[in-house]
Amino acid sequence: MEEHIQDRREIAFLHSGEFLHGDSDSKDHQPNESPVERHHESSIKEVDFFAAKSQPFDLGHVRTTTIVGSSGFNDGLGLVNSCHGTSSNDGDDKTKTQISRLKLELERLHEENHKLKHLLDEVSESYNDLQRRVLLARQTQVEGLHHKQHEDVPQAGSSQALENRRPKDMNHETPATTLKRRSPDDVDGRDMHRGSPKTPRIDQNKSTNHEEQQNPHDQLPYRKARVSVRARSDATTVNDGCQWRKYGQKMAKGNPCPRAYYRCTMAVGCPVRKQVQRCAEDTTILTTTYEGNHNHPLPPSATAMAATTSAAAAMLLSGSSSSNLHQTLSSPSATSSSSFYHNFPYTSTIATLSASAPFPTITLDLTNPPRPLQPPPQFLSQYGPAAFLPNANQIRSMNNNNQQLLIPNLFGPQAPPREMVDSVRAAIAMDPNFTAALAAAISNIIGGGNNDNNNNTDINDNKVDAKSGGSSNGDSPQLPQSCTTFSTN
């Protein structure tokens, strides 16, 4: 029996932990060990992996930590290194801290960018406001200068003043024209500005329109007025002292002679143009039509023609009559500055206004014979008719020499032109009764004014009649027609 017991071997059940720890630990976890096992070390050991009461396996150097996230449940396994004693969550915390710092920095940059954007908008608005104010100030300054120039320019008293005034009027714009040509952006910008004087500008336009209604002749532009000059000339053009360049010609209806077009080349951008064409009825007559005003200084040889055309255009646009125009053109200022009028000692221009032309046109005809020289009315009223007639001594000198007639200086110390003297000589040579008629007129005037010197007057008259072979009558004689008109043609 004992032998049978000794040969019997028992099977011992071990837990998984006891199997891994070996025999040294198995003694502590086997409290109900049989006495047979104490004597017999060779026993079969089995591992029970399905034990009901299994204890947690402890490796000794590894422990489990639970990580609870923000969601409330365990979302990770945190392993702690036994050597360093640090957890993997520390790196995640550092990353999250850096991310939150970056978010704060980004928010700060966004806020700063928003402030800078707002500041830029304010600066842009201030700049636009300042620019509108500068434009308004410039416009006001230009309008003030233009108004001042209109006040400083004298009235059309002389042809030279008119000549200097026309280019300014053509180059400068009126305030109404400037406001019409203003761009829509400028108008909108000035209306948006709360400080812009919108109402005064409208009142200024109304006042300008009122002035234009009061002066309808001022609305006509000087550039559109044309002055035609008819003169006899065999040359291609009339020498008016300016330099011209021909830029074209064309045939006109009803005239076999072509019409040539010229522009002034004395200065760059000079707006003056002229058209030259011969008359169809008389080819010796050359018609020159001027348009525009010179914007540059003129030589002395060109001043007379420019002054004449400017005066004619001014009279045309101002609505003056042809008689006033004739007086203006007959003034010494328009005829004494150039040799162009030396062939015309007395201006006998016939001014003709043309209403059928597309532009206001005035024609100055220089082909007619000159009119007789008539002294101004103030000289006649002050000195009387006897002051302009020669005395008896001058008549004797004329009869003795039979060469020249001593004509007193009526209009100043200047001597009469040579052409006039030649014309007088020719008239005296053609009419032998001139001296007799002139002596009779003088005797009648002197005899009626001085009763005390009747005898001397009769003696002088008899001497004159004896020398001239004429007779004096009681009636006042009339001067022959050939003596009252001087022709230089």
Curated annotation (Swiss-Prot):
State the Gene3D superfamilies in the record.
WRKY domain
**A Pfam family it matches:** WRKY
The primary site where this protein sits is nucleus
Give the start-end ranges of region Disordered: 15-43, 143-222, 449-489
Which InterPro entries did the record assign? WRKY_dom (IPR003657), WRKY_dom_sf (IPR036576), WRKY_plant (IPR044810)
DNA binding happens at which residues? 233-299
- Where is the protein localized? Nucleus
Annotated Polar residues bias: 469-489
Domain of life the protein comes from: Eukaryota
What are the alphabetically sorted keywords of the record? DNA-binding, Nucleus, Transcription, Transcription regulation
Task: State the name under which the record lists this protein.
Answer: Probable WRKY transcription factor 47
Any one GO MF annotation of this record: sequence-specific DNA binding
Q: Explain the purpose of this protein.
A: Transcription factor. Interacts specifically with the W box (5'-(T)TGAC[CT]-3'), a frequently occurring elicitor-responsive cis-acting element.
Q: Name one GO cellular component term.
A: nucleus
Q: Basic and acidic residues: which segments have biased composition?
A: 144-153, 163-172, 182-215
